[in-house]
Curated annotation (Swiss-Prot):
It holds the Pfam family Ribosomal_S7. Belongs to the universal ribosomal protein uS7 family. It comes from Thermococcus celer. The gene is rps7. Disulfide bonds: none annotated. One of the primary rRNA binding proteins, it binds directly to 16S rRNA where it nucleates assembly of the head domain of the 30S subunit. Is located at the subunit interface close to the decoding center. The keyword Ribonucleoprotein applies. GO terms for molecular function: rRNA binding; structural constituent of ribosome. This is Small ribosomal subunit protein uS7. One of its GO terms (biological process) is translation. Part of the 30S ribosomal subunit. GO terms for cellular component: small ribosomal subunit. Keywords: Ribonucleoprotein, Ribosomal protein, RNA-binding, rRNA-binding. It comes from the Archaea.
């Protein structure tokens, strides 16, 4: 008797991200971020850009893929200007998603080895600790410009956290023997533990402190 199409192909009982890590037990404690952190069971976190032209489409992109996309940006130096890292003309990961995928996968393996925890859960904790709740905007009134504290939308909170995690890792491995994967793993672990020495967490504290002084 001929096998059906379904029987011919292997179907795993549970899809694991990158074939290694389950998302079933991963929890998000922050209620505002919960709807925007996509934790679908997906073997390969790659959406082929299908959400790029949709309003708020990136909310449907898997959280691991969003980290990979941030890793593909130009790197940061160890120098700052106005509180921000200066960028370098480094194209080693720009537009190279498979290479960025391997970097993130290696970083997750380092996190799992050091913490004995699911690295996706550690990443979620790092995002929650690095996402600023308040920021400042410039208001013009009567020809005078001044700063005003505003609440940050959940989607932007997520963007800022992921961007600063990737930037902090890039700056940490600038001109030294530390690999990007190792630096990324250290940045995620430190941010998950709310370590003030890490760039992502310290930047969040700085943004909220400036916003509080602008109330």
């Amino acid at each position: 008797m001929a096998k059906t199409l379904t029987e011919r192909f292997y179907q795993p009982k549970e899809l694991k991200v990158m074939g290694r890590w389950s998302v079933e037990d991963v929890t998000v404690n922050d209620p505002s971020l919960r709807p925007y952190i996509n934790l679908e069971a997906r073997l390969l976190p790659h959406s082929h850009g299908r959400h790029a032209k949709k309003a708020f489409g990136k909310a449907n992109v898997h959280i691991v893929e969003r980290l990979i996309n941030k890793v593909m940006r130009s790197g940061a130096t160890s120098h700052k200007a106005g509180g921000h890292f200066m960028r370098r003309d480094d194209r080693s990961l720009m537009s190279k998603k498979m290479k960025a995928y391997e970097v993130v996968k290696e970083a997750f393996m380092i996190i799992e080895r050091r913490t004995k925890q699911n690295p996706i859960q550690v990443l979620v904790r790092a995002i929650e600790n690095s996402a600023p709740r308040e920021d400042t905007t410039t208001i013009a009134f009567g020809g005078i410009r001044y700063h005003m504290a505003v609440d940050v939308s959940p989607l932007r909170r997520l963007d800022i956290a992921l961007k600063n995690i990737a930037l902090g890792a890039s700056a940490k491995c600038y001109r030294n023997k530390t690999s990007y994967a190792q630096a990324l793993a250290e940045e995620i672990i430190a941010a998950a533990n709310a370590d003030p020495k890490t760039f992502a967490y310290s930047r969040k504290e700085e943004i909220e402190r400036i916003a509080q002084s602008s109330r």
